[in-house]
Amino acid sequence: MTEPGGPLSAAETVHLVRQALEGGEPMASVTVIEWRASGESSQVARAGAHLAVWSDRSRGTLGDARLDERAVELARAALSGPGRVASHEIETEAGVCVVYVEPHRPPPELVIVGAGHIARPLCAAGALLGFRVTVLDDRPEFATRERFPEAAEVRRADFADPFRGVPIGPQTYLVLVTRGHKYDFEALMDVLRRPVRPAYVGMVGSRRRTRAALEQLAREGVDPERIAAVRAPIGLDVRAETPGEIAIAIAAELVLERRGGTGRPLRDTERVYERWVRRAGE
């Protein structure tokens, strides 16, 4: 659906982006950066024209209905996947329009269940990585703003119903690091019984405890696909020992899940020495 109205100014577009992000709604902005006319054709789109696009509607115009239609398709494609800022050429009978498509998404949510020694450095790392961090714990002396100054929210929660009042959606990353395996498991069961699938669910624990938890989930009839997706034991294998090291291993896995990649050292994937330096010396 295209909402009525004429061209958008840059200020109006910025306002719509800010409004969407504050409301937790993804959107994309499309901006004309160049118009190349075909022969004697008149200029259809002018550099600086803006279009605002959501999943179900759009506002503004680039100057031509067919041009708008194609721009909306590009914007929604960027929103539906991990699309990043990109320029595209849209060909029309009158010429070629070069547009800049920029997806705008609310920051992903990182919910840390447990406010202990791993949670503190993980909260700091999560905020640094651009997550909106919420920390939950049932102990009032642990669930404090002083312990987690980087968190957007610090909540005292009942581990019998840990996510009450906490929205969980497809852009939520959940890390279960409570003071006891029993609480981790109960929170995990709560999450996996929900119809919505979070972007990431990870649980701390030894190999033995992880196996026991996953076997229990299978006995409870939880979808095997959901069980297999649980990151447990949590984090990348960097032989982490200290709370800070464990937090960094978890944070690295969050980035891997969010951005994609192999998790291997870049030295091994790029092989700069073998491909160029050593070859040049032979």
Residue ranges and their predicted role:
Residues T31-I33, V113, D137, V177-T178, ...:
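Short beta-strand segments
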Residues A119-R120, D184-F185, T210:
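Short, well-ordered alpha-helical microsegments
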